[in-house]
């Protein structure tokens, strides 16, 4: 009997600890700090957070870890960014969906240039970049719920990797850069590809399918778990490297658009919310 009581007590304690460890978010920026296109969070080597469309469309905001904020750049007329990544030099690469470009920003001079423009682009939505500075870009056509997948080499040349996909949106590389993940917002699929260092993709397979809510930006943590923002669902779902749903993290807003990892240990998470027009944060 005592043994059974010990077992029950241990199970109750484990359950209680798990409840206590549930993650909750807090506001990193005030409500309504951004336009409704609040998106594209990325953290640089200094721990500074960059998010697009701060205060209004067509800007990039920069935030210190203590929350101090500024408009870092106003993009050229006709350009609206949706994603930010950093190359090996620390330059910012942006997916410019309204200008149909990949833009580059020098962080020291704040000069904006066009890194890639291709008339075949629908509207570049999200990007990721490997250690060889090869860019992968999702390119949806929201009018007919289709999408494309692109590779953009260091010389700015764009190569169409796949067309006829669903509504391509979130895109991410695994930490070892051997797997490329691409999701389809409307179809709720996450696809995985094998990828070589020079950006060749192969072995496409279905990594995970969701039954509800939209899919938006995705990021991997250092262990290779894939964090998928669930637009309209008010949560981030976390998938293990073998494609299992391991946890869900609730957000205060419903329209979760993207996330980024930061902090000295890489466990501070910044989340963009389009309905609340702000950034939420949590410790992972």
Go through the PLM ranges and name each one.
Residues 32-49, 76-96, 101, 118-148, ...:
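Beta-rich, blade/repeat-based domains predominating
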Residues 19-35, 204:
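A short helix->beta-strand "capping" segment at the edge of beta-propeller domains
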Residues 51-73:
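Beta-propeller domains
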Residues 172, 178-189, 197, 201-204:
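Glycine- and Gly-Pro-enriched alpha-helical subdomains that act as flexible
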Residues 63-68, 106-110, 152-156, 194-199, ...:
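Short loop/turn segments that connect beta-strands within beta-propeller blades
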Residues 1-22:
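Bacterial Sec-dependent N-terminal signal peptides
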Residues 29, 70-74, 113-117, 159-163, ...:
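Beta-propeller fold detector
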Residues 59-61, 101-103, 148-150, 189-191, ...:
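A short loop-to-beta-strand structural motif that recurs across blades of beta-propeller domains
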């Amino acid at each position: 009997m005592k043994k059974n009581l010990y077992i029950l007590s241990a199970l109750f304690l484990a359950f209680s600890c798990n409840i206590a460890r549930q993650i909750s978010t807090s506001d990193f920026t005030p409500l309504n700090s951004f336009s409704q296109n609040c998106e594209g969070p990325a953290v640089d080597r200094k721990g500074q957070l960059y998010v697009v469309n701060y205060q209004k469309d067509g800007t990039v905001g920069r935030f210190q870890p203590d929350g101090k904020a500024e408009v870092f750049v106003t993009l050229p007329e006709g350009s609206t960014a949706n994603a930010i990544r950093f190359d090996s030099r620390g330059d910012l690469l942006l997916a410019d969906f309204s200008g149909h470009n990949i833009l580059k920003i020098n962080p020291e001079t704040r000069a904006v240039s066009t890194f890639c423009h291709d008339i075949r682009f629908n509207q570049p939505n999200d990007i990721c970049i490997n250690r060889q500075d090869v860019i992968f870009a999702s390119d949806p056509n929201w009018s007919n719920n289709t999408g494309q997948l692109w590779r953009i080499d260091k010389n700015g040349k764009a190569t169409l990797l796949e067309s006829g996909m669903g509504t391509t949106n979130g895109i991410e590389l695994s930490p070892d850069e051997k797997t490329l993940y691409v999701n389809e917002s409307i179809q709720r699929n996450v696809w995985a590809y094998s990828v070589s260092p020079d950006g060749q993709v192969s072995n496409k397979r279905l990594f995970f399918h969701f039954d509800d809510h939209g899919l938006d930006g995705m990021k991997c943590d250092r262990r290779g778990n894939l964090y998928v923002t669930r637009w309209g669902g008010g949560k981030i779902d976390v998938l293990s490297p073998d494609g299992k749903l391991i946890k869900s993290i609730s957000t205060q807003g419903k329209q979760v658009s993207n996330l980024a990892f930061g902090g000295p240990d890489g466990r501070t998470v910044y989340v963009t919310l389009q309905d609340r027009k702000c950034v939420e944060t949590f410790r992972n």
